[in-house]
Amino acid sequence: VTTCAGAKYLIEGALDFAFEREQFSRSISNFDMVKNKFANMVTKSWESDSINYMTTGAIDQAISKLDKNDDNFYAGVQKIIEDHSIESSIAKVLGSETLAYTVDEGVQVMGGAGFIEDYPMAGAYRDERINRIFEGTNEINRMIIGGYVLKKSILEEIPIRLCIQERVDNWIPDSDIELENKEYFNIVEFCRSLTLNITNKLILKYGQDLKNEQWLLEPFADLLISFSILDTCFKRFYSLNEGDHKSKTERVFKLTLANHYFNSLEKAQIILEYINDDDMIEKISIEKSKLNYKPNRIKYKQDIVNDLYNHKKYYLDIFTRYFLNHIIIVN
């Protein structure tokens, strides 16, 4: 949570400098490569923020149902926290890597001034690196993410086989969702089916030995992280009331959707190449072709930067209601 908050704060610091600094007789904020950096900062911060709110809110909601006078109250709290270990690890990895990206690109925007202690970026650049190491390195947290999903799937706490049976011939289930949100829903559900199938393939091939296959655990964890971002961010966007804030959020969500759709495909490809599953590679290609999905990520970034420049700071801290649930790969 603190790393995400730090990223939002540093966006404003880098933005203030970019507006003031001139090069070649114009503000560096007008250069497209600088705009690209800011669009990515905003999007990554919003994704991390969404995961944080979902995770902490779900834990808080579950704890609120416990009887504080019960002798087993604290044991119950511990059980709830353990039940959210996957979400917590995702939040830790995502938050620390979001801050790392924002600090690094913030220094790049500021140039040599980024190392001067008069600016907040210098201290952040010096201190940020530890976030990917303590509280469990991000590598250990990725092992937790993949390992816990594996464990829950084998114990059928996540009903992998049932869900796959329901999606054998149709990776995108029918829905009465509004037409304007149909494409978003379809992409999220495609990625859910993709993640379910990759999980199943790994369980069938390795079983519990998967925990020793770190070449696979890392891309598998990244696949799970990407799907968690897609699922949570769609629910956050969908829960918003119609209006100006939802329109601005939608512009960021479009970029999130495209980025993690392609990242999911890439991680799945890496896994399937390694385990030599050409049939699943072909199946993914067939199902993907049904989407006819043609995102325009540069246009999305241009829209995000326009909103950011108008606000002159991170501008997406508005919630209408909770969108709480476990991050799991089944409905």
Per-region residue spans from a language model:
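Alpha-helical interface subdomain recognition
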Residues: 1-331
